[in-house]
Amino acid sequence: MTTAIAAPRRTSARAASSTNLNRQSRPLATASRLPQSRLLHIVAPSLKVPDAAAASVFSAVRTRGPIARDAVAQLTQLSIATVNRQVTALLDAGVLRERADLAVSGAIGRPRVPVEVNHEPYLTLGIHIGARTTSIVATDLFGRTLDVVETPTPSGSQSAALATLASSARRYLSRWHRRRPLWVGVAVGGVVDSATGYLDHPRLGWVDAPVGPVLAEALGLPVSVASHVDAMAGAELLLGAPRSAPEAAGAPARTSLYVYARETVGYALSIDGRVHSPASGPGTIAGLPAQSELLGGSGQLESTVSDEAVLNAARRLRIIPAEGPSSTLAAVLRAARQGNDKAEELLADRARVLGEAVALLRDLLNPDDLVLGGQAFTEYPEGLPVVEDAVARRSVLGHRDIRLTAFGNRVQEASAGSVSLGGLYADPIGAMRRAQTRRSAAV
C-alpha cells in the first residue's frame, strides 16, 4: 500500500534549537480552538498495564488463548464467577469468541469451552508523526502489525499538513474492506495535550495543532494522542513480554527508564506498570551537556547525536559524498561495517556521548530497568558495548543491565500501535461501545 504525502518542511537549525529550549516552559496556546463538540471523541491515551476485571480477563485471553475460564481465573486471581461474567460481556461485545472445537472431551457446560480473541473482524490505526517521516500502521487486537506505510511528514502550513494527514489516513482505512477500524492512536514529538489532542511541535512549526480533533472528524473514530517517547515506553508495557497476574501482583513496584535517540532524543519513565505522563508534557533531554570533537554540535545532546549531526560529520570527514544518493546514514553504517576506521570512530563517539547521557539519567532516576530505543541504538547494535562502557565509567551507581527495545527498528510503528490499542486494552467493553457510537454518528 502506498500513500502520497508531501515532503516535510525544514526549519533552520538555529530556530529549531531555540524553540526546543523554551518549549517545556510555555503552555499550549488556547486561541482559535475548535468547538468543544469536536473534542468529545478525544480520549487520553492509556499507557499502562490494564488492571480492571474485564481488562485483566481480556489480557489473559490475548496472551494465553485459546484458554478455558478456570485457567483465566487462576491467571488473573479473579473468582470464577467474576471471570464468567466478564467473558460473557466480552463475547457480547464481540472481542472474544468461543472455541467449541477445543472443548475438553466429556466436559459438560459452556464454562469449559475455551475462548480466544476474535481478532479477524477488527483493526486499530496508528500514526507515528516523525520530524521527517510519518508511519501509518494497521494493528490487530493482539498488537501485531498487519501493514505499515512510511511517507514523508507533510510540509506546508499547519492546517494543510493536518488536512493531508487526515486525507491519507482516510484513504488508507478505505482499503480495509474486511476489518472494522476501532480506534486511532497518534504518537508524535513535541508537547502534547492528551486531554484535547492538541500539540506544539517546534521541529514542524506546529503551534496548538488540533491533530486529534482533525483526525476524529475525518475518520469518525475515537482518537488518542501521546508523546512519541511515552508511546514507545507504553509499547514495552502493553506489547512486550507479558507477566502473569500472580507474578505481577506479588512483585514490588518497579520503575523502567526508556531512552530514545534518532533524529531527536527523549526519555520516558514507567512506574509500577504505568508510563508517567505529566499534564504539561514530557520533560526534555535535548539540552543535556554533550561534547564531541568528531560530531560537533552546539554542546547539547540532541544537536550532537542526531542523525543529521552524524551525516554532517561524515560528510566533513569524507566518509560519504557531500551530496547524492550515497550521502546517507545507511552508507555511513555500511562503511563502518566494511572496516572504514573513520566511520567506526564516528559511530563509536556517538555511542559514547549517548552512554554518558544515559548514565546521567540513570544516576538521577535510578530505575530498576533500563531500555534503549530508536535507530541510533538499534541500527548499529555494534555500538552497544561502547554505550555500556560509557554508562559504567560515568555512573556512580552499581552495575545495571541495559537492554535494547524488544521492537528493534520497528519501534515507531509499535509506539503508534500501543496508543491505538491502549484504550481497548484498558476497557475493552467500553472501547467497543465508544467506537460503535462514534462510527454510527459519523455515518
Each predicted region: which residue ranges?
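ATP-binding/phosphotransfer module of carbohydrate and carboxylate kinases, centering on a glycine-rich
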Residues: T2-L102, G106-V148, P154-A166, R170-S174, ...
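Phosphate-binding/catalytic loop of phosphoryl-transfer enzymes
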Residues: I127, L141, W183-A187, V191-S303, ...
